[in-house]
């Protein structure tokens, strides 16, 4: 039997000025579900990073859309952020994901590439699917003891 859930879908233009709408919507949904304040703040950062990556990288000069789906389950919130823009070499980027050497001065940290590390750190699970565009599925559990620790929290799927 399939697990029951409610779904909220949104589409916004892939422009920076619309990211706050998604962040505020997610915060309202998470608050209604009973998430703790700190978890809501973590999810706000994660969804902002995912959307900002699309705004900056997916469509280059073209105008595109960001599709967002919230899956409201009894014990978790799943957030899917997707675009149909230009995909990139995810495996190459994944190999460069933090943690970063704290002995290096801040000036030597890369300007890009922290978003995926932040999302991975702040969410309980993250899956990234890439083929045409990019889809990021982020999960946050209401009760953290339900999180599995398999040592590889980022997984990737390629469409065939």
From Swiss-Prot:
It catalyses: L-seryl-[protein] + ATP = O-phospho-L-seryl-[protein] + ADP + H(+); L-threonyl-[protein] + ATP = O-phospho-L-threonyl-[protein] + ADP + H(+). It holds the Pfam family HATPase_c_2. GO terms for molecular function: ATP binding; protein serine kinase activity; protein serine/threonine kinase activity; sigma factor antagonist activity. Keywords: ATP-binding, Kinase, Nucleotide-binding, Serine/threonine-protein kinase, Transferase. Its EC number is 2.7.11.1. Belongs to the anti-sigma-factor family. Negative regulator of sigma-B activity. Phosphorylates and inactivates its specific antagonist protein, RsbV. Upon phosphorylation of RsbV, RsbW is released and binds to sigma-B, thereby blocking its ability to form an RNA polymerase holoenzyme (E-sigma-B). This is Serine-protein kinase RsbW. It comes from Bacillus anthracis. The lineage of its organism: Bacteria, Bacillati, Bacillota, Bacilli, Bacillales. The gene is rsbW.
